């Protein structure tokens, strides 16, 4: 807190500090949104940083194409130093969710985009105050409000992941992703958008709940009571998830893992990742 106050005194034109009780990342972001004044807002997680040229690149891009949301790439640092992630969608072209439903499938982090501030002032969309998946919930909802989305090929965000990071939290916390997905599905259903984006929402559920959460558990141990719950959750909300057209594009290894998970062959999945050195 002292360092923040010092920086604010040294740079009063661009730094303001709000001291509040710790309520998690989502709660902090919501509090900051009420103070934001610029045309766009960005979200920077602790330990992460922007590349030196990030703001110049963003400013030029948004001046040329003033989109409501402007995505950019990230590079992993720390344990996965050098890995680069960008979206496999048309670049530097204004997109909308109805025309490009695959926008729902891009990386869910709120930190890899500049968001027009009026998206928040004109809607009641905010971050979940607590629990895993606060980014996924906000970003998947906000895409329905955005009139235009632009994706830049530039890697502007440096994401640091290490053994103590939130993304490597306790195994039991994987249950929270089910709450996050349910929050998104309920939101789309309430607005009559579920059927329009059912395939995309189904893939979102398969990826985040059935695959990612199960794999995080099975890389660490061969059994856990949460594993069948993840499968039952997915099957209850998307009974035909195995026939989702997006799943045809999965790599062979991921298809194999999903098949084994669907048969509750958890030990086989554990051994598969153990053999690969995970």
Task: Give the location of each predicted region.
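Catalytic core of nucleotide-sugar-dependent glycosyltransferases
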Residues: 155-163, 168-195, 208-241
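Acidic donor-binding segment of Leloir-type glycosyltransferases
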Residues: 1-19
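Conserved hydrophobic residues forming the short capping helix/wall of the S-adenosyl-L-methionine
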Residues: 4-8, 62, 188
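Donor-binding/catalytic cores of nucleotide-activated saccharide
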Residues: 25, 46-150, 160-171
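Glycine-rich, basic loop-to-helix element that forms the pyrophosphate-binding segment
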Residues: 2-3, 20-36
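Short aromatic/hydrophobic "clamp" motif used to bind/position activated sugar donors
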Residues: 41
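General small-molecule cofactor/ligand-binding pocket signal
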Residues: 18, 150-152
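Membrane-interface aromatic/basic loop that binds lipid-linked glycans or pyrophosphate carriers
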Residues: 219-278
